[in-house]
Amino acid sequence: MKESERYEENQFKGRNRRLLNEWRRLEDRLEGRRDIQCEAVRRNTAGLPVRYLVRYNLRSICGVSDVEHLGEPGVCNTPLYASGYQMLIDIPDGYPSIDAPASFRFLTCDDKGRPMAHPWHPNIRYFGDFSGRVCLNQPDTYTDLAWCVERVAHYLRYDTYHAVMEPPYPEDLKVASWVIRQGEPNGWIFFDQE
C-alpha cells in the first residue's frame, strides 16, 4: 500500500486535497523507477507533504574542467559528470495560486556544508546565491509536481534546455553561454539520450 492511500480524499478540502492529489500522482508516476525516487521530508498539521526530497540517479554534467577561466578565449572547458543529484521541492502556504508556486532547488552542499555535485544546465542556477534553483516554465497552475519532476529529469539528460538569450531567458547565463559556445559544437551535451 502506498503511503498516500492511508488518507481519504473526502476528508480534505481546498489546498489539502490538492496536496493529497499531488502526493498520489508523484507516487503513481515514480513507482518502480530506479532513476528517480521521491520522499516526503516535511508535512503540514494534516500529515500531508509540503517538502519533498527527490533523488535523481542519472548521469549528467555537474561542472566543467576549468571553471575559473570560463568564457575566456582559447580555453577548452570539457564537462565533468556525476550520477546522483538531490532536489528539494518546497510547497508554500498559498500553493497552488499563481503567486505561490512550488520551488525546486538542487542541493549544493550536504548537511555539514561540504559541496556536492549539482547540475550544470542553463535552466538550473549554478553560480551565486541562488545556485541550485530550477527554472520551470509550467504551462499553468494545474501543472502537477510529477510533471515538474519528470521535466527536470529531461533537463539532466539534456533532452530539454533553453540556452539562447531570448524569452524565457536561461536561469544561468554563464552555463548557457558554455552550452552555445562549447557544449553544442563539441557534442558534449549529447550523452546517454534515450
Language-model features and meaning:
Residues 1-84, 94-194:
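UBC/E2-like fold recognition across ubiquitin and ubiquitin-like conjugation systems
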